[in-house]
């Protein structure tokens, strides 16, 4: 019997890197509302008392960068100087320029279908049937712990919680099936008023137990709640935050490969983002169709070229048909040119700020999570 452990982590919406991601995507959303053809690459840096928003943006829109950044920071919950970061009073610096005309000429075309990729690169998408949302379980539950932390913080259940937090879930597998939770790590920022004893009990009862399946918890499960003790100094006061530094948290928690490109702050002409969403969409529909228990898709692009330079399908021995047939089905049923996938997934809409915390995948409100191609794929495969 093969037995192994697998671990994934998540971070809260108040983690410094996630503050940066959310500001970048909030700027993108506001621009797309006015100018769907905008070219946006927005990067954010946050540290004690300041947020710097920079990057390259070409658009006919005008947006109030300072207002957007402050609104995001306050929405997250940083509204007091006692936390070391206050959206009302922090400095907001603007360092935005325009996208290179050399890139524009390679991307824009008279016929939108021939729109070139905004850059070269490799992108991966993944799906597995070990959860109902066809995502790896460890990252799914790590995200849910962070969502629960924010919920009990904001609704007043645990008013002494603060926005910065991290989670980590270690699952035990036997014969590739989950048999239990081996360990849970949850570190959360808190006010100075709460005792460690009260914090440990509250986190266990209000965050961990409501989220993790009871059947996976046992006397052998290990819990590490704020294992260093005090966590009063957090957020940008404790660490600087940068857009694009949580790419594994954003995707599959290490259960699948990653091409290296971050998502937040990028408009959908950037295949780092849009093709990664399309690869998830393809992989999820293959698994939903019952053509494999696990599926990983790799796509690659050349700057200024519309057609992908490669498509790979890997089903890790779980495929019901040959991987080569799946590649042919992908080419036949999915338009993976930049404009094709933007149209297929309706990516021009201002939906991106919501993606910037708790993972881009496994959340059914996003269009790349639809399984509307599963039936046609199953029929085309002859199953």
UniProtKB/Swiss-Prot annotation:
UniProt cofactor(s): Mg(2+); K(+)
EC code(s) of this entry: 2.5.1.6
Domain of life from the UniProt record: Bacteria
GO BP annotation list: one-carbon metabolic process; S-adenosylmethionine biosynthetic process
Catalyses which reaction(s): L-methionine + ATP + H2O = S-adenosyl-L-methionine + phosphate + diphosphate
Annotated K(+) binding sites: 43
Keyword Phosphoprotein applies: no
Enzyme class: transferase
Cofactor note: Binds 2 divalent ions per subunit. Binds 1 potassium ion per subunit.
Gene Ontology molecular function terms on file: ATP binding; magnesium ion binding; methionine adenosyltransferase activity
Chain positions recorded as Mg(2+) binding sites: 17
Keyword ATP-binding attributed: yes
Sequence positions that bind L-methionine: 56, 99, 239, 270
Primary localisation category: cytoplasm
Keyword terms of this UniProt record: ATP-binding, Cytoplasm, Magnesium, Metal-binding, Nucleotide-binding, One-carbon metabolism, Potassium, Transferase
Residue numbers binding ATP: 15, 164-166, 230-231, 239, 245-246, 262, 266
Function: Catalyzes the formation of S-adenosylmethionine (AdoMet) from methionine and ATP. The overall synthetic reaction is composed of two sequential steps, AdoMet formation and the subsequent tripolyphosphate hydrolysis which occurs prior to release of AdoMet from the enzyme.
Family note: Belongs to the AdoMet synthase family.
This protein's name: S-adenosylmethionine synthase
């Amino acid at each position: 019997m093969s037995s192994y452990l697998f671990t994934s982590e998540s971070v809260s919406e108040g983690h410094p890197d996630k503050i940066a991601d959310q500001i970048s995507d909030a700027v993108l959303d506001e621009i797309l509302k006015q100018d769907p053809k905008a070219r946006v690459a927005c990067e954010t840096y946050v540290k004690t008392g300041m947020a710097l928003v920079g990057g390259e943006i070409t658009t006919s829109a005008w947006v109030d960068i300072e207002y957007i950044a402050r609104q995001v920071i306050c929405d997250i919950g940083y509204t007091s100087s006692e936390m070391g970061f206050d959206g009302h009073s922090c400095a907001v610096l603007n360092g935005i320029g325009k996208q290179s005309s050399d890139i524009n000429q390679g991307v824009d075309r008279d016929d939108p279908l021939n729109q070139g990729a905004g850059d070269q690169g490799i992108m991966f998408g993944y799906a597995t049937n070990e959860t109902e949302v066809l995502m790896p379980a460890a990252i799914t539950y790590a995200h849910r712990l962070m969502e629960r932390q924010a919920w009990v913080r904001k609704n007043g259940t645990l008013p002494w919680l603060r926005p910065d937090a991290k989670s980590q879930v270690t699952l035990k597998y036997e014969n590739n099936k989950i048999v239990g939770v081996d360990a849970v790590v949850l570190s959360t920022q808190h006010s100075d008023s709460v005792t460690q004893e009260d914090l440990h009990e509250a986190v266990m009862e209000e965050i961990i137990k409501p989220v993790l399946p009871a059947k996976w918890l046992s006397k052998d499960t290990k819990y590490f709640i704020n294992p260093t003790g005090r966590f009063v100094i957090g957020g940008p006061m404790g660490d600087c935050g940068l857009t694009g530094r949580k790419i594994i948290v954003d995707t599959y928690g290490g259960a699948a490969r990653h091409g290296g490109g971050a998502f937040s702050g990028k408009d959908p002409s950037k295949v780092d983002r849009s093709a990664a969403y399309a690869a998830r969409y393809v992989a999820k529909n293959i698994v939903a169709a019952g053509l494999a228990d696990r599926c990983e898709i790799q796509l690659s692009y050349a700057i200024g070229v519309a057609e992908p330079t490669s498509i790979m399908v890997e089903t890790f021995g779980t495929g019901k048909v040959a991987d080569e047939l799946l590649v042919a089905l992908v080419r036949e049923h999915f338009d993976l040119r930049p404009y094709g996938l933007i149209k297929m997934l309706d990516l021009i809409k201002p939906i991106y700020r919501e993606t910037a915390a708790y993972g881009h995948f496994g959340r059914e409100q996003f269009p790349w999570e639809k399984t509307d191609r599963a039936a046609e794929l199953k029929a085309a495969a002859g199953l």
